[in-house]
Structure formats: structure tokens, C-alpha cells
Amino acid sequence: PGALWGLAFTLPLLAIAVLDFVQKRHSLRRNYPLVARFRWLFEDLRPYLRSYIVESNQDGRPFDKNARALVYARSKNQTSTHPFGTELDVYSDEYEWLSHSVAPNESVPAEFRLAIGGPQCTRPYSAAIPNISAMSFGSLGGKAIAALNLGAKRGKFYHDTGEGSFSKYHALYDGDIVWELGSGYFGCRDAQGHFDEDAFRKTATLDQIKMIEIKLSQGAKPGHGGVLPGAKVTPEIAETRGIPVGEDCVSPAAHSAFSTPLELLAWAARLRELSGG
């Protein structure tokens, strides 16, 4: 009886081995009869073996075992805390932390501001950390400009005019202004588009103008510069920028007031002199 049971077990395996050897579809089964079939078995078992035997609690993407366990626990209203430290290597390069100091600095003042202006500056400015970045009148409408300036007034931070110059809407609420000068010199240009010192002085000496910003180039519009189509040049925009109504408004690719770094520094010094700062 024992031999019969042995044959009952081995004969099917032998038949499978012979079938593998004579078939011509899979070279692996032909070269390794019967044994090659374990390859596909382990391929099917691979995800389970990796998940339950090989994979650690920190392996797995996008969510590792710990993250999944946390979700499972919370979905069942169970505790998701893990006592006695952590399994993570918090000393590796991917982790950062703040260390306690035995000699801490003084507490930060309630209103933290940054002083702008060196010893040569006669009109230094105390700036907030968050401010309103450059957005021109023309790209934004008058109501938007006025609303932004009112926010600057209430929040005690500055409002950058953008390259489109200082408009009457910037002046409505007397919020602090940073006047940006680009290559088009809008608001302080002559008929040929060059820098006009008298026009600059008239605006720059206003109490509302706190700083002058020089825009060196056209950034996302290099080469040909920026263009505001004539259809968008309304009488208000033309008056603000000092350009003809209904004609294309061109911001050149480079400045005409300077062409070298030293000339830029000399021009910046001249702007300081003209603005009284």
C-alpha cells in the first residue's frame, strides 16, 4: 500500500515533468521540467511574502505600514499613538528639528519690521515683512489698485506700483508706495521715452512715495520687451504713464538711462538725490 501511495503522488508529477519537457512554448519549462513552475508560483506569492515577511514598517510608497496602520486605527476609533519613542531614524539627513537653547534670544517684538536704508539715506523706511508685490495699473483696474492700497494703509505695509507708474488710484488712501521704474520710465519720461528728471522729482518727493525700485529688465519678456496693446491704452492709463492714448505701449528690453553696472550705480545715486532720500 505504501508503494501505491508513492506512485499516486509521483506519477502525476512525472507526467507534468514529461509534458513540460516535450512542449515547445516555454523554454524555461523545457529546460527545467516541473521545477520551473515554482517560478510562477512565487511570482504570485511575491506581494504577500514582501508585505508580511520582507517589508519593514517604514517601507512602502506612497504610504508605509505605519501610515496605513494609523488610518486603520482611526477608522475604528482606536488609539493611533505609538508609545516609547519612534522607529524612524530622526538623525538622518531627511529630518530637521529645532533645538532648545540654554541661552535663548530676546522675544520677537509684536510688530516685527525691517529697516531699509544705510547711513547715506536721509529717508530710511521701516518695512513690514509681508507687502504687496508689483502689479501695474493697466494690468489691474482702478478699483483693484485702490483696494490694495487701502489694505496697505490698514496693514501698515507697502504697496509696489509695478512698472505702470503711480496713478491717482494709488493716491486715494495714502498707503505707503514703492514706485517701480522700468525701462519705459512710465510717469517720468519725455516724448521720446527717455528718463525725465523733472517729472521724476515731482512724483518721487511726495510723502506717500517711500522707496524707489529699479526694474533692471523685462524678466519673462526678454529680447523684445513688453507691449501693452493700444486698444488697452485708455485715457487714464495714458495720463498715468505719460504715453499717447490708443497707441501700443512698449517697455524696451533694456534701459536707456544706463548701459553698464557703474552707470547703473551712478543713476541710482542720482535718483536718490532727485527724490531727496
Where are these regions (language model features)?
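Hydrophobic, Leu/Ile/Phe/Ala-enriched alpha-helical segments that form helix-helix packing faces
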Residues: 152, 268-275
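Active-site beta->alpha loop and helix N-cap motifs at the rims of alpha/beta catalytic domains
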Residues: 218-220, 243-264
